[in-house]
Amino acid sequence: MQRALSSRTSVLSAASKRAAFTKPAGLNLQQQRFAHKELKFGVEARAQLLKGVDTLAKAVTSTLGPKGRNVLIESPYGSPKITKDGVTVAKAVQLQDKFENLGARLLQDVASKTNELAGDGTTTATVLARAIFSETVKNVAAGCNPMDLRRGIQAAVEAAVDYLQQNKRDITTGEEIAQVATISANGDTHVGKLISTAMERVGKEGVITVKEGKTLEDELEVTEGMRFDRGYTSPYFITDAKAQKVEFEKPLILLSEKKISAVQDIIPALEASTTLRRPLVIIAEDIEGEALAVCILNKLRGQLQVAAVKAPGFGDNRKSILGDLGVLTNGTVFTDELDIKLEKLTPDMLGSTGSITITKEDTIILNGEGSKDAIAQRCEQIRGVMADPTTSEYEKEKLQERLAKLSGGVAVIKVGGASEVEVGEKKDRVVDALNATRAAVEEGILPGGGTALLKAAANGLENVKPANFDQQLGVSIVKSAITRPARTIVENAGLEGSVIVGKLTDEFSKDFNRGFDSAKGEYVDMIAAGIVDPLKVVRTALVDASGVSSLLGTTEVAIVEAPEEKGPAAPGGMGGMGGMGGMGGGMF
């Protein structure tokens, strides 16, 4: 019996060693780094990438134009999301095939970059990228030099952008601003007027934010305040986990030009916050070490509402901005020149404000309690420095930013609706419209509906001088691709794209503003009809799309992680061994 048990023990020991040696799952980081890859070359690689690009583009382009369709996206929490926003649709796509997903992810990058730079035009960028890449793939497969194709594409894009810049129109009136916003909000005139009103109230350099409202109607709130591009120093300060931001009502503000690391420096401010039962926001060059640890600990224990933010700017500019904040909040700025140290702080030295919102990237201070006279005096002081002939252009730019933040207001558009889904969809449209309007004010407008790109195809590429035949093909690819947005808009309206685009590029080629209103189904002067696109949006979409898609065309090898191989199933429990009458594992 003893011999059988020892024999069985040795068998189990050997089995466990083998299992440990061949264990397929739970690879550590070092093992994963050396996991084998899967490669595809040449035509096969580009075909797979194109398949992924086509799949994503098909989903995104269905939203383009006044009669574009909505897309329903599953949400990991809450209700599904309904949207017509191109970048939202693009980001939601994840393909099963890894090579196809490579192409889709590059197109997602195009959409995201365009959205980041221009705030709109993501669907147009997707349409252009797909058109340029698909034609590039065909020509490379036919034997063209991909690098020459890319050079031709880049030359044509530069010529098209020059043509658009020569024919742009600056916008000045509130009516034109409303038209741009209306188009970007998919024809919603109410949203257009709301954004136009907000821009009039805070000025073109003012700050406008969009939030989800709690009523059925949209609301516009304009409040005096300041925004700067610094966020919370630690995510532990977040009060709204879903929105990933800190929101305080009536906080106290501690302003310091120096780094804060010692606990003694913040104890008086923390005590004042506790005594007055008000949140505390520390704005300093930096907060670190024990001081930061104490703030986080107090916040996590729920003993104190506190947050820390790095002061905006650098050097002298930081000192000036902190001075602005001091005037705005009626607080003392602790500097090297000030005789009083932080540990001697009294509650009356802390600034105060109506509310503050802090995200990862920026901070908005509303209703600062500084006196109107002090703020006006500070603004005059800034204007005086700007008027000084010795002030450089760079310094004037920074001073203008400070003046706008100090004298301008903050407009908050609260989007209303009957349900969470409706409010979410509408908020996407309002954000798009706001971004497009800012872009239009910045660089001017063009006739919308893809018309400007159509006219660039007809008239803007005549002076491009390619060095060889392959570069000429690159120019032809762009000439064809930039007609695609207009064609897609028309086709999404259920009309024949080829006929209408043909008429616009032949009969109306010399009339820059003449285009097709897909909503009404008629040829009109697009500017007069209020159908416009910001130059910045069109330019950014074209440049980003051509850059990535022509680079994709030069791809010769695609490499992805190979799928994990499933190892053999772990051996089951040892049943009774032969002749042992099924002695169970209970003996071990």
From Swiss-Prot:
Transit peptide: 1-34
Superkingdom of origin organism: Eukaryota
Subcellular location: Mitochondrion
GO MF annotations, alphabetized: ATP binding; ATP hydrolysis activity; ATP-dependent protein folding chaperone; DNA replication origin binding; protein-folding chaperone binding; single-stranded DNA binding; unfolded protein binding
InterPro entries attached to this UniProt entry: Chaperonin_Cpn60_CS (IPR018370), Cpn60/GroEL (IPR001844), Cpn60/GroEL/TCP-1 (IPR002423), GroEL-like_apical_dom_sf (IPR027409), GROEL-like_equatorial_sf (IPR027413), TCP-1-like_intermed_sf (IPR027410)
Entry keywords, A to Z: ATP-binding, Chaperone, Mitochondrion, Nucleotide-binding, Stress response, Transit peptide
GO biological process, one term: 'de novo' protein folding
Principal location listed in the UniProt entry: mitochondrion
Cystine bridges: none
Pfam (any one): Cpn60_TCP1
Family matches, as SUPFAM superfamilies: GroEL apical domain-like, GroEL equatorial domain-like, GroEL-intermediate domain like
GO cellular component terms attached to this protein's record: mitochondrial inner membrane; mitochondrial intermembrane space; mitochondrial matrix; mitochondrial nucleoid; post-mRNA release spliceosomal complex
Expression triggers: Up-regulated when grown with elevated levels of potassium chloride.
Similarity comment text for this entry: Belongs to the chaperonin (HSP60) family.
Role played: May participate in assembly and/or disassembly of proteins imported into the mitochondrion. HSP60 are ATPases and have affinity for unfolded proteins. Involved in osmoadaptation.
Xref: NCBIfam families: GroEL, PRK00013.1, PRK12849.1, PRK12850.1, PRK12851.1
Descriptive protein name: Heat shock protein 60
Organism, scientific name: Emericella nidulans (strain FGSC A4 / ATCC 38163 / CBS 112.46 / NRRL 194 / M139)
